[in-house]
Amino acid sequence: MASNKVSFIFILFLCVLSTAEFGEAQNPRGRKCEDPNGVDQKAKCYIYCNEQGFLGGSCQGYTNHYMCECYVG
């Protein structure tokens, strides 16, 4: 019975990790950006994310709400 509980908790833990986009760094306090296509022509997101300790970033979002999204790799 105890092994069933351990298995259930382990599976639940894996489900939480998979929905949290494990391996992709998220920066909830991002910077607003102007390039709606993720191009980041002025490299504002790239520079901002490097200053935050990430390897890079791009401009993501929807109409009138584009933010820099930083990532690890």
UniProtKB/Swiss-Prot annotation:
Keywords: Antimicrobial, Disulfide bond, Fungicide, Plant defense, Secreted, Signal. This is Putative defensin-like protein 33. Belongs to the DEFL family. It comes from Arabidopsis thaliana. One of its GO terms (cellular component) is extracellular region. Disulfide bonds join 33-59, 45-68, 49-70. It is found in: Secreted. GO terms for biological process: defense response to fungus; killing of cells of another organism. Residues 1-25 form the signal peptide. Coiled coil: none annotated.
